[in-house]
Design a protein with these regions (language model features):
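DNA-recognition alpha helix
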Residues: 31-44
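C-terminal domain-tail junction helix/linker
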Residues: 179, 190-232
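Short, basic alpha-helical nucleic acid-contact segments in DNA-binding proteins
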Residues: 45-46, 53-75
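Mobile genetic element proteins and their domesticated derivatives, centered on retroelements
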Residues: 21, 35, 51, 80, ...
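Active-site beta-loop-alpha junctions of metal-dependent nucleic acid enzymes
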Residues: 12, 57, 106-128
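Two-metal-ion RNase H-like nuclease active-site motif
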Residues: 73-86
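Short conserved beta-strand segments at catalytic cores or DNA/RNA-binding microdomains
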Residues: 29, 87-103
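RNase H-like two-metal-ion nuclease catalytic core shared by retroviral integrases
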Residues: 159-175, 184-190
Length: 232
């Protein structure tokens, strides 16, 4: 409880309310004003600006704790990159997911050339604490450069349609981008996408693949993990 008090020191609202607001923001397609209204309906009067500050401050903390609790990813990674417009300039969002659709990493860069691909590969290898068994990408040549220089022994599949899993994984980001009316800066976008990926992965339970009983059990475990990282 001492850690909880220290983390939420100088905040007049209880930790339970703050962590719930942060969870709502990163779990669902809601704006800060939407969450302000949801809390007001429960008799909790807090400004959308306070909610924004909570999300910016505590979101990365919770995300880092979730990553430390994670057991690991599957041994097959799907990589893809899409462009996002930030302050009128085209940037590239690199993303890697595993076979379960869990997000391994997201990384914003201004290019998608060989050096950019190598930077992304280095992050992946560091986060995974080693090489995966195989990687799946599209036919962008930059992936071949990074694969040859950094992990030549890893199987590399770039066949047509093999990378659909990674391409589909961008959809939640596109939805949030519209809700937020585009990202305001590289720093803000990287922070949001990193936390969003951690929360998405925690609650990515494959609802359509398991029974209702199994889903409720997995959901309870996910909620417990969230309580641990946010309230202890």
């Amino acid at each position: 409880m001492k850690h909880t008090i220290a983390r939420y020191k100088r905040h007049r609202f209880p930790p339970e309310i703050i962590q719930h607001a942060v969870w709502l923001y990163y779990r669902f397609n809601l704006s800060h004003r939407d969450i302000e209204d949801l809390l007001a309906e429960r008799g909790i009067i807090v400004s959308h600006e306070s909610i924004r500050l909570w999300c910016n401050k505590f979101g990365p903390q919770f995300s880092n704790r979730l990553k430390r609790r994670r057991q690991g990813f599957s041994d097959r990674f799907y990589l893809d990159e899409v462009f996002v417009k930030i302050q009128g300039k085209q940037q590239y969002l690199w993303r890697a997911v595993d076979e379960n659709g869990d997000v391994v990493d997201v990384f914003l860069q201004s290019r998608r050339d060989g050096p950019a691909a190598k930077r992304f590969f280095k992050r992946l290898l560091k986060k995974n604490q080693g090489e995966p068994r195989s990687i799946v990408t599209d036919k962008l040549r930059s992936y071949g450069v990074a694969h040859r220089d950094l992990c030549p022994d890893v199987e590399h599949d770039s066949s047509l349609y093999a990378n659909n899993r990674a391409e589909l994984s961008h959809q939640p980001t596109r939805v949030r981008e519209r809700v937020m009316r585009r990202f305001k800066s590289m720093k803000q976008a990287q922070r949001f996408l990193t936390v969003h990926a951690s929360v998405y992965t925690l609650f990515n339970l494959g609802r359509h693949l398991v029974s209702a009983k199994s889903y409720r059990f997995l959901r309870s475990e996910a909620f417990e993990s969230w309580r641990v990282v946010s309230l202890t």
